[in-house]
Amino acid sequence: MMNRYNETGTIINFSARTYMNHKCICTYASDDEKLHAIIDDYGVMYSPDGKRLLDTVRQLKHYEVPEGVEVICDGAFCFSGLESIKLPDSLLAIGCNAFGNTRLTALTIPRNVRHIAPVNPIATNQLLLDKFECLSPYFKVVKGILYSKDNVIFYGAVTEDYPEELEILEGVKAIANGAMSHRAHLKSVSIPDSVTVMGDGAFHCSGVKKVKLSQNIDRIPAECFDDCRLEVFIVPEGVVNVDDSALGHNDNLITVIFPKTLKNMGYNVFSGCPSLTRISGPRKSNFMNLKDLQKAGLRKGVRSTRENCIIDSYDSNREGVTMHLHN
C-alpha cells in the first residue's frame, strides 16, 4: 500500500479507493492547474473552464459555489475560516479534506455528488456539524455517521449524535482516513471482519478506550490510534505492518500484544506511552529486541511509571518494559 501527502498535508491512503464502485473523479489540483487558474473576487481559485474549484487564496466566511462547478479539489477550503457554504447541483465530486479546519456548522451534499474521496470531509475539524444533509443517492447518514450507500465505505462522524459505543455496519470494507479523528465522546468501537482497509489517522485523538478489530486487516495505519485512551491493544493475526505512530501518545496504554504474522514496525509506534509495561510477541520475531523497540518509541533514560521494569531481559539495568516472548 502506498501513501502520499497532498498539498494540504492530508495523507491519502490509496488502497481505500479500491472500494469506490462508482466512477472515481480526479480531485487533485496540480501546480500547473493553479498556475493557469482564474481567481474570483472572493479569492477562490478555479480552472479556466470553471468546472474545478482548486483552492482559496485568502480567508472567507460565507461562500456560494456557482452552478457549473463539478469538482471541489483536495483541501480547497481547508484553513479558509469558512463558516457557511452553498454547493451547486452541478457538483459531482468532493476531494480529500475539502472542508477541513473550517468553522462550518452545516453542510448539504447535493443530489448529483457521486464521489467523495476516502477521507472524512470534515476530518480535521475539532467541532462537528449541527446539521448535515445528504441529497445524493450514493451516500447515507446513519446515527451521525456518513457511509457510502452500499455500506462499503465508512466515512465517519459528521454530526454530534454519533454513538459513544460505535458498531460499524457489517459489510463495510474500508474505513476512511480521519473517520473518527478528534471525536472525544467515542468510548469503544467494534470493527466487523468485513473491513480489510483502515485509513491513516482513522481514530486519531479520539476518546476510544476499547477496540475490537477486524480479523481481516493486514495493517495498522499511521496514527490510526494515536492520542487515544487505550489500555490494552491486541494486534490481530494476519497483520503484517504496524505503521508510524499507530499507537503513540496513549497515556493509559499498559499492554500491547503482537501476532506471529507481524513483519514491519514503524517509527514511534508507541512513543509517548508512559504507562506501557508489557509488550508481548513471538519468540522468533525480528522486532522483539532493544534496537527495534527503541525505534518504535521506547527511549532509554525516560523516567515514567515503567521505571522499575526492564526493556531487555538480558540487561536488567535498562529501564523500560518487560518483553513477554511466546512460541
Regions found by a protein language model. Give the residues of each.
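Short glycine-/acidic-enriched loop or helix-start segments at secondary-structure transitions
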Residues: 96, 118
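Short, well-ordered secondary-structure "scaffold" segments embedded in the functional core
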Residues: 120-122
